[in-house]
């Protein structure tokens, strides 16, 4: 790289592309895990929580589409929208966690399916986090600004209030 004397933009694009490829690979790993866990739910009773997971997955799908569009067009405004959407996904995940705990406490028969649903939801939430990482990489590549500190890392599902 240094033999060709790349400009700062070239280096930022290269670093960002490497980070983005890693995030995309992790997203694929989470998707594979979701598919494996989904097979275990075919014989389980359908819980209302699965509707929340559906809404959460639609939001994350939109985030993925938007972040890929932002990458293709170097659109930092769209990338910022993806970052802002992550908070909603995190809130849905926390709400779902509490809902699933309630189902498990109400009836022991719900423990297995609730556990699978929880891990599916966690994987969807992590896919959203990786979409947000990609959005941050886009902003860095285009503007040279690292948006670190904008969002809180980790989730609040296990925090005691």
Q: Where are the predicted features?
A:
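Cytosolic, long alpha-helical scaffolding segments
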Residues: 1-161
């Amino acid at each position: 790289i240094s033999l060709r004397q790349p400009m700062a933009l070239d280096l930022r694009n290269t670093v960002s592309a490497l980070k983005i490829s890693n995030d995309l690979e992790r997203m694929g790993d989470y998707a594979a895990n979701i598919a494996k866990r989904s097979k275990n739910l075919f014989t389980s009773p359908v819980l209302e929580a699965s509707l929340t997971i559906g809404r959460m997955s639609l939001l994350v799908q939109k985030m993925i589409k938007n972040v890929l569009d932002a990458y293709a067009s170097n659109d930092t405004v769209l990338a910022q929208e993806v970052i802002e959407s992550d908070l909603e996904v995190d809130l849905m995940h926390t709400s779902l966690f509490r809902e699933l705990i309630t189902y498990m406490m109400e009836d022991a028969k719900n423990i297995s399916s609730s556990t699978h649903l929880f891990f599916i939801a966690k994987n969807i939430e992590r896919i959203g986090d990786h979409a947000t990482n990609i959005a941050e990489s886009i902003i860095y590549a285009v503007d040279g600004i690292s948006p670190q500190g904008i969002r809180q890392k980790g989730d609040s599902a296990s925090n005691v209030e």
